[in-house]
Amino acid sequence: MEFIRRFVGLFILYGRFVLLAVGGYVFTMSSYAFSGKERAELFVSGWRFHLGNPEGDASRQDFDDGAWRLLDLPHDWSIEGDFSADHPARKEGGALPGGLGWYRKVFEAPREWQGKKVFVDFDGVYMNSEVFVNGNSLGVRPYGYSSFRYDLTPYLKWGERNVLAVKVDNSTQPNSRWYSGSGIYRNVWLTVVEPVHVGHWGTFVTTPEVTGEKAVMEVRTMVKNDGQAGRRVGVVSTLLDARGRMVAGQSGFVDVPAGGCSEASHTLIMTAPELWSTEHPYLYKVRTELKVDGRSVDTYYTTTGVRHFKFDARTGFWLNGKHMKINGVCMHHDLGCLGAAVNVRAIKRQLEIIEGDGLQRYPLHA
């Protein structure tokens, strides 16, 4: 993972991989932190898939999908088809078929989850998806390049069989000028939290002041309360170095109304910070812990790097006070003959090639 870490912290993170910019421009403040999914588990194995619109209502819990194909996500059904110039996607869309497909997954919701919140997170579905749980529609997501989340809690049957169904419609062609793929082409996650928890992507970490001697880190945390009563919540922010040792910390309280959210802000100060660079890709973690009545109810980790940079119209780009020439490539998100479904090893190989060519800029074009 070392070669991937050399890209992290300077620019924006995309899913679990890195890109430098969107449209050629860098979007960042002094620091941008990627919040991980430590409380979530991958929800990608044991799905059933059917290409086309089946007879009957495939969203229903009691629908018989026994004859459907068994597979693991991520999945791109277009790459499995035959190439033809007659496909509506045309050569610009890869000359591969689109169409409509269904995915279904059976899972159990343990009784110990009762009283908690259960969410399903989709990192990417192409395109125009509708998600159902036990026959209940959770919503429709247009297009296909944004992650999205649904709350499963009101529809789950505790200690019983539950069914998640996803309809994916990529039949309107052409709809892009590149190969898009079709299906649930990114990971799916199941997140289980207490009613009081850090909100979705609920931490934002910046470093407004960075030198070789000192760094000031601002940590903003959105605390969500899905309970029936207001809560006074203790918020503890702890900065950890790469070995897990405490560097700085601050705590406080926020009052969070029932069904609402409140923001906690902390300032962490470190001396002699390890500055992130392509040669020294050092990463810290911010651990955010929430407490209600002295009991820990949620712990959330945010990975971040500490560095400072500037663009100068005359001299170019500077990182940590050193001049740096930015070289890179522009790529679409698909993996060639492997299709659009994310493949970790294939992306590692891309980054290895990029690094081997002396490049450090990796914007995704979509």
Language model features: what each stretch is:
Residues 113-117, 156-161, 230, 270-285:
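Short glycine/proline/serine/threonine-rich loop/turn segments at secondary-structure transition edges
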Residues 133, 214-255, 262-266:
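Beta-strand-rich binding/interaction modules
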Residues 103-105, 146-150, 252, 260-268:
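Short strand-edge motifs at loop-to-beta-strand transitions and within beta-strands
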Residues 39, 43, 50-54, 93, ...:
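Accessory beta-strand-rich segments of carbohydrate-active enzymes
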Residues 38, 54, 203, 287-356:
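N-terminal carbohydrate-binding accessory modules
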Residues 166, 237, 286-288:
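Hydrophobic/tyrosine-rich beta-strand signature of extracellular beta-sandwich/beta-rich modules
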Residues 191, 255-256, 303-307:
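Short beta-strand edge segments in extracellular beta-sheet folds
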Residues 32-85, 89, 163-167, 171, ...:
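Accessory carbohydrate-binding/adhesion or oligomerization-edge regions at the termini
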